[in-house]
Amino acid sequence: FKQNPEHFLAEASRLVKEQKASVIIEKLSYDPTNESYDVDIFTAEQKITDMTKAVSGVNKHIYDYVVVDSQGIERDFVTELDTSKEVVVYAKLPRGFLIPTPVGDYNPDWAISFKEGSVKHIYFIAETKGTMSSLELRGIEDRKIECARKFFEKINAEITSENVKYDVVTSYSKLMEVVSG
């Protein structure tokens, strides 16, 4: 505190906000509305895409290329999705696809549809991370993931007869463990 009071105050403020968010999220519930996403969210960003991060020559993505956030994990994930016999189609969710949370909007990474009969969960929303350790995920990001779990639980309970599974995965093999279980 004495050496850097500004840093101390900023860190204390961050910790208080994280704890406040945890308390709010414990009581959080989502209620369905009649709103829907316009299909334009999948095409609006295509005009301003950074093609240096694109993986081209893909067959099962909704486009013939995928723009990835990271060159390691997501690029490998795309390669495995595209060559998998179980995957029918997948999409990198656009930045406009947002789940509202008390700590800010959350944008999951992937929507994946699997071949019926090949896995237990046919429809899957995935967040790809380099690590599963909640200690290594930023506090706010971890809270958003917690909210997304509640969001998809509500969708499954009240809106759709088709079960939409959501989880955080570190690789394609981890994804297959989750959807097969």
Language-model features: where?
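Intrinsically disordered, low-complexity, repeat-rich regions
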Residues: 1-106, 113-181
